[in-house]
Amino acid sequence: GGEGRGGGSKQAALATVLYDADFPKKWFRHFFRVPGKRRNAVETRGDGYKTTHTPPENTMSHKAPKPFYPLNIAILTVSDTRTLAEDTSGQYLEDAVRAAGHNLAARTLLTDDKYHIRAQVAAWIADTNIQVVLITGGTGFYGRDNTPEAVAVLFDKTIDGFGEAFRAASIAEIGMSTLQSRALAGIANRTAVFCMPGSTGACKTAWEHVLKDQLDSRTRPCNFYPHLTRSEETS
């Protein structure tokens, strides 16, 4: 009761101030404007006439589009049971890479041998013509799943967000079974290395939800291209 009456008196006092003739009209419009709407501003001149002007558009939304720069990408499939002819996951990644406008620099298949994997990835990292390495397979918890142990020691910096983003995207498809993936990524010698599970579905999730945009130099507000080029103009 008492609070209601007091609140009503305050509202009445506020209304008196807002509707007072001497209260600047533009302040009144400020208090009651609809957020997000762009409207003409009306100002009253000293002679009593009103002038109207349109506020400028937000120039931040009109940035010039970034150019597309293709990357040289190598693909490694890790499997004890597949051959290149049966490698549907590696083939999916190759097709996706080409469709996105990038260049396939190399593609091979190795068994789950930690040292063979490490040697191949290290060679690609040392190759200044290769900017991205995509690895499919060997990221689980079985005894022969050695990809994380093979490549993590090669990283100068880890890309923690890749594994997080991949597992988050996978929840809609496989639920909490996504915890069984040790997907990881890192950068070494300006080469980005992304490790994902061996299934074709997992490769598609990683590419469509994470890699496709982050390897595209046009993606705003940021992408991996500047970290992978040795050109001073784009770094």
Task: Place the predicted regions along the sequence by residue.
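Glycine-biased, low-complexity coil/linker segments
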Residues: 1-3
